[in-house]
Amino acid sequence: MLIVPKKCDIITKYTYFCERIGFEMKKELSKLYDPKEVEDKIYKFWMDNDCFKAHRDPDKKPYTIVIPPPNITGQLHMGHALDETLQDILVRWKRMSGYAALWLPGTDHAAIATEAKIVAAMAEEGLTKEGIGREKFMERAWAWKEKFGGRIVEQLKKLGCSCDWSRERFTMDEGCNKAVREVFVNLYNKGLIYRGERIINWCPHCKTSISDAEVNYEDQAGHFWHLRYPLSDGSGYIELATTRPETLLGDTAVAVHPDDERYKDMIGKTVVLPLVHREIPIVADTYVEMDFGTGVVKITPAHDPNDFEVGLRHNLPVINVMTDDAKIVADYPKYAGMDRYDARKAIVADLEAEGALIKVEDHAHNVGTCYRCGTTVEPKVSTQWFVKMEPLAGPAIEAVKTGKTKFVPERFDKIYYHWLENIKDWCISRQVWWGHQIPAFYCDECGEMVVTKENGAVCPKCGKPMRQDEDTLDTWFSSALWPFSTLGWPENTEDLKYFYPTNTLVTGYDIIFFWVIRMMFSGLEHMGEVPFDTVLIHGLVRDAQGRKMSKSLGNGVDPLEEIEKYGADALRFMLATGNAPGNDMRYIEDKVKASRNFANKLWNASRFIMMNLPEDFKLGGIPANLNVEDKWIISKFNRLAKEVNENLEAFELGVAVAKLYDFIWDVYCDWYIELTKPRIAAGGETAETAQAVLVWVMQGMLKLLHPFMPYITEEIWSAVSDSDVPCILSTFPTYDEKLDFAVEEAQFEKIIAAIRGIRNRRAEMNVPPSKKAALHIETAEAEIFEQGRLFFERLASAAEIVIADKVDMPDAVTVVTDCARIFIPMDELVDKEKELARLNKEKAAVQKDIDFSSNKLNNAGFVAKAPAQQVEAEKAKLAKAQEKMAKIEQSIAALMK
């Protein structure tokens, strides 16, 4: 059944609420805009009136975004703020554009991270999870989730996120749990999930397996220890080098390349393992690089993934020498219980004492660390659950190649393809308790194993109760189902039929593998369709110096603190302005301040309009008797609406917001409002027309700006609009051919260009606005400039205006535009000698700046050693000084005429 609210219901609720909390139509706006007074009130209004709620409507196209579910352990950071701001902009735009827009929210259970926090809290009470048992631990975990899991949601609301909170989901709620079991069983029955002994990545701190994608690699300074392994027959020794002497205890072979002439005669012989004195074979394997090190490799199948593969090929035994917390096992009494790094020192000392250590070399190498805690990962042979990836990767590659899903920017296709074309089976089992317990059951009586969606399985062979697998699933397993599990799958719900596939996924490039790829193959496998049409990739938010924000650097910025200082709209506007798809951006607080100043500019413009409207003012659309400047602003707004829609359609959100900024600040506030002031002061019909156009354009601007700055636009909308519909539910402006006054717009731009040129020249000559100047305008388009007489007088401080097709004033200062030359006699305005003295003094100071920057940039040492950012800043400084010098010289030349 389709549920569509009646528009009158929304209007009635809106009007009632406006009256109840003091939203008065055409109310007087306060002198200053205070976000703290407005934001909570506005958000409550939206929530109380179900403004975010999505309804299935056969007359509307659906537009769906699923939120990348933040961890319940999470605190809103700048990455979240950027991610959610971009999504909210798109959803608000589509909602206003007539779509049934659903932004589906939720949170992720974050298995390892959440369990770590709960275990730490228990440790303060002197408790362990093993000590209280799984059932009691899970009770504590759910209690922790209820207490702390909603913090991130409240923080998203502070940002202004217009999610449909009535549909909020959690990756471990009943519906998601049902979907997870369904998928696991389906994939297992197809042979795409299997259990086996493989070498996996083990985190000794988290004490769980992690997938290849969850390992971060970093260069670390280390050593090559060159060791002597004596031949068993006493005929000599073989030399090899290793970065991990502590794993020597588990060596089961040494390997050489079959084509290496140095060692051909040794293949098949045995060596004596130092310290352990166990005989191990010399095997030939093409894995060995002849020209690296000594061309000999020790093989430890239990502690290196490549060695594990060599071991399989040569049927070598697997000897594990470490416990789950990376300590030496009891089989080696001298080192038993030692941490791996302490054992390394002890073993190296013993090797030296035994005469097996030849030399030690410095060596930098890649070390894998756990993405959660940063601990060095230990390769470990273990029985785990895996997803067979190759059969799932093919359709996911094809879906992007055929355009069913596109990446924005397109260059991220390559990263996507690279991951899928080189993918390995996914280790999905984790040795933690908080998460989806694997639906596999074992019979201790007869050894039978059953994979089933049902709880409390009974052995089908012997009828005895079965115990469930202790392990849980990788957090990303449930996240991979997010686009359809949140809409009711595996049930074929009405929501699923209407809102799936979703439209846009907004996410960072750092989780393309973790999440995007896994959602792609999950959607294709279980729904038969891609999960989303478009993947919009954004970069990281870095600090002002371009560094990644991190706890270690202490350079993180709390979005909530910035919202407290400047308001949510200012933060959102800055994030949108600095965003270009796929690129990192820098967080610069001055830009947030500039965004707040922009909000204040808009507020003040609105106050001016409201203060100058008559009590009986009624907006009846655009009047018929428009002046040229009215047609100019209407036409420019009409084109702005067209371009903003095009930019949003192309995901150029930063471009759209820059155009809005320029139009509102420059075109509307600095020009059109100033142009209307004399008309409003004069009163009569021309004032009424100006007021009507001011309000009409303001309303349109508020609607265009609303997705970016929702709070202030909604507040002003309640004052300047006669509509009973709130701004969030109003209609987004689009291009209207009837409002395209291209001819008048072009004509008036010529007047604007002339006024701007006159103002600039007067400023360069240090002429204050209070001094009136004569203007002699030479132009072939006199009719256009005749229309601008009033504007030249008011905005260009013109006293006398002469318009002619020919002007001869060689001693006057000249302003040149594309259709006119404007002569300004300066004799009565400027004391030439005094002004020349000032300009020459300024010229000398600027020359010093030019010389300083030039000398710096001509210094090869500075250019080579200084940070690139500093060099570029110096170049920009030089260019600015040179530009200033050119203007000074131009002013001097004008005065010397």
Region locations from a protein language model:
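Conserved phosphate/anionic-ligand binding catalytic regions in large, soluble enzymes, centered on
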Residues: A81, I238-V256, R372, E378, ...
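Short, solvent-exposed turn/loop segments enriched in Gly/Ser/Thr/Pro and often Arg
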Residues: P58-K60, P68-P69, L102-E115, E168-C176, ...
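Feature 926 captures the class I aminoacyl-tRNA synthetase adenylation module centered on the KMSKS loop
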Residues: D9-E24, H226, H418-F477, L481, ...
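Residue patterns forming the tRNA-binding/recognition surfaces of aminoacyl-tRNA synthetases
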Residues: K27, L32, K41, F45-N49, ...
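Extended active-site and interfacial segments that coordinate phosphate-rich ligands
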Residues: A81-I89, I238-P274, V297-D304, H314-N320, ...
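Secondary-structure transition/capping motifs at alpha-helix termini
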Residues: R92-A100, A121-R134, E154, K158-C163, ...
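N-terminal catalytic cores of NTP/NDP-binding nucleotidyl/phosphoryl-transfer enzymes
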Residues: H55-I118, T171, V180, L240-T243, ...
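Non-catalytic terminal extensions that flank enzyme cores
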Residues: C8-M78, A101, I358, Y371, ...
